[in-house]
Amino acid sequence: MDAAPPATPEELDAYERVIEEWLAAQLEENPSVEAFERDRDSGDRRWIVRVAGEEKAHFSVWFHLRQRTLHVETYVMPAPEENHAQFYEHLLRRNLNLGGFTFAIGAEDAIFLISQIPVGRITNDELDRLLGSTYAYVEQCFRPAMRIGFASRFKG
């Protein structure tokens, strides 16, 4: 990412409106989007989007508008119970083909999928790409990763 100056409060307000309008349209037009909510408690410009999946029945995608970037993340699964090396190798190899997204280890060693873009790239098309990619990558990776990291639960 380039070292663009931080967005002004007015620019952030404009990006916030783009995100809010896009989310409202997604709720109406995208059957995978079940709900969205603005996080008003934190004082940050953050939204949580509830998504219905197939491999993973439901998950939430966070959009966090910062001064220089829009950060996107979703919780994928807890830390593996077994086959740790194989599990993390699997996710690291998947990172090569995730088009600007990365699997990351978060609190309590949980697995998250994250991405970010410069605020100047926030458009409806880019928001579509971010949400669509999050959906696709969770759907592609969830079951194989679960079968590795929780293998004994899948026997029988």
PLM segments and residue spans:
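A short, solvent-exposed beta-edge/loop patch
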Residues: 104-137
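Short amphipathic alpha-helical signal-transduction/dimerization elements
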Residues: 96, 135-146
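Charge-rich, low-complexity N-terminal segments
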Residues: 1-56, 106
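Short, internal acidic amphipathic alpha-helical interface segments
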Residues: 70-112
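Short, highly charged C-terminal tails/helix-capping segments
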Residues: 146-156
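Short beta-strand-to-loop capping motifs
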Residues: 51, 74-76, 115-119
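Short, charged/polar surface micro-motifs in flexible loops or helix N-caps
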Residues: 53-58, 65-70, 77-81
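Short glycine/proline-enriched loop/turn "hinge" motifs that connect secondary-structure elements
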Residues: 53, 62-65, 102-108
